[in-house]
């Protein structure tokens, strides 16, 4: 079994609202993040991602369940592993009139980190050449990279990033994505919480999808995609009749404009053969390639606290 840097068992968090009513934010979450690579932590807004991260970092108290970081029980043992963890959970505060370098130098002195770590952090996040510019002149993407640089001053083994690309333009998203890849290549394990699924698919090696505070699926990205539905887009002269024939033939199908989409792992020849027996001739039969966003939407549709859990990890 791979070494786990993060492990939660039955993790639960219940809040009381202003009227004193209980609200479940995290409902018995079992999370396992292996060492190495980039692990996506995915879920709709309000699914419990940030609450889970805050509990792992000792910023919120769990109602019940257990948590372990590097095999150490937390929050009790958190001080012994804190130097191995870097995290960007909320927008950090930097001095606007200091340069990026000056901000990092000040923080390094506070943390007791050697001055050489400032150079390493600046280089790692790609701020070389802009590190002497004032913080207030930075773009949002550069500010996010400086925030990541600050977490690297203690040379962490685990980096936790909560929605690091929120509000960024495409160029800023690409910069953060490249930074995450570089960190992973250097041996840092990254837990990436995000809802920008196309970006996650490009950078993550594994992922956990949660909904309503509970795990819905977990595994490598390839395993998650293989576990989702596949199918074909069918172009035919009479889509209404084709939809009826396919439905009566046991296929799950739906029509969008003049195209019939069939959700099935059966061969495409089965579809064309069935249609041909009803004198429906296929003009085009195109395999549908499942992406992470499609799988995510399929998995979280109608999700409830009592919904099924899928663990596709092998």
Feature names for model-found ranges:
Residues 120, 222-226, 309:
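Short, flexible cytosolic linker that couples an ABC transmembrane/permease module to its adjacent nucleotide-binding
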Residues 3-211, 217:
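ABC transporter nucleotide-binding domains
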Residues 177-263:
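ABC transporter nucleotide-binding domain
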Residues 111-115, 173, 236, 265, ...:
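Short alpha-helix boundary/capping motifs
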Residues 66, 99, 231, 281-284:
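Residues at or immediately flanking beta-strands
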Residues 2-3, 264-314:
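C-terminal coupling/interaction segments
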């Amino acid at each position: 079994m791979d070494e786990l840097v993060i492990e939660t068992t039955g993790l639960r968090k219940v809040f009381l609202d202003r009227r004193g009513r209980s609200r479940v934010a995290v409902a018995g979450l079992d999370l396992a993040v292996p060492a190495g690579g980039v692990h996506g932590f995915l879920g709709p807004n309000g699914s419990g991602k940030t609450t889970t991260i805050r509990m792992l970092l000792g910023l919120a108290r769990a109602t019940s369940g257990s948590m372990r970081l590097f095999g150490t029980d937390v929050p009790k043992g958190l001080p012994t592993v804190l130097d191995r963890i870097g995290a960007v959970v909320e927008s950090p505060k930097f001095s606007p009139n200091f340069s990026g370098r000056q901000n990092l130098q000040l923080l390094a002195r506070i943390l007791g980190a050697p001055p050489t770590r400032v150079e390493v952090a600046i280089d790692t996040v790609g701020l070389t050449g802009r590190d002497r510019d004032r913080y207030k002149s930075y773009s949002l993407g550069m500010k996010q990279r400086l925030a990541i640089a600050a977490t690297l001053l203690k040379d962490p083994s685990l980096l936790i990033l909560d929605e690091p690309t929120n509000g960024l333009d495409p160029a800023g998203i690409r910069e953060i994505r490249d930074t995450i890849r570089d960190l992973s290549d250097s041996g840092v394990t990254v837990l990436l919480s995000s809802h920008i699924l196309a970006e996650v698919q490009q950078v993550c090696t594994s992922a956990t999808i949660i909904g309503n505070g509970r795990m819905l699926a977990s595994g490598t990205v390839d395993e998650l995609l293989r576990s989702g539905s596949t199918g074909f887009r069918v172009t035919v002269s009479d889509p209404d009749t084709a939809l009826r024939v396919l439905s009566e033939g046991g296929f799950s199908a739906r029509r969008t404009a003049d195209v019939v989409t069939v959700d099935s792992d059966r061969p495409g020849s089965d579809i064309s053969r069935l249609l041909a027996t009803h004198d429906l001739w296929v003009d085009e039969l195109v395999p549908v390639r499942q992406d992470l966003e499609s799988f995510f939407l399929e998995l979280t549709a109608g999700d409830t606290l009592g919904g099924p859990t899928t663990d596709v990890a092998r």
